[in-house]
Design a protein with these regions (language model features):
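Long, charge-rich, low-complexity alpha-helical segments
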Residues: 30-88
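Long, low-complexity, charged/polar intrinsically disordered regions in eukaryotic proteins
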Residues: 1-32
């Protein structure tokens, strides 16, 4: 599934993050899926999703260079497919 960077997203209420030295683990208590956020910057993006009007706004606020947005969009799409993040 592709993600619409112009839409607003948030961490699913059934998902919990656990910080790790290089990123974070995210466990979804509803579907029992475990995801790994591989970079601290991706952790920041996921945290900022709830406070921005779009995923693009969260990427910008996290300081992700525009050239890396496609990579981050793919990561966010995978998190959406796993129901870790939801559109709001």
């Amino acid at each position: 599934m592709a993600i619409d960077l112009n839409r607003a997203y948030q961490l699913n209420p059934s998902a919990a993050r656990r910080p790790e030295p290089v990123g974070a683990l995210v466990y979804h208590f509803g579907n029992r899926r475990l995801s790994f956020l591989k970079t601290r910057q991706l952790v920041t993006v996921v945290r900022l999703l709830a406070s921005h009007d779009s995923a693009a706004g969260a990427l910008d606020a996290a300081g992700v260079p525009a050239g890396q947005w496609p990579r981050y969009a793919a990561a966010l799409a995978a998190l959406a497919d796993s129901e870790v993040i939801d559109a709001r």
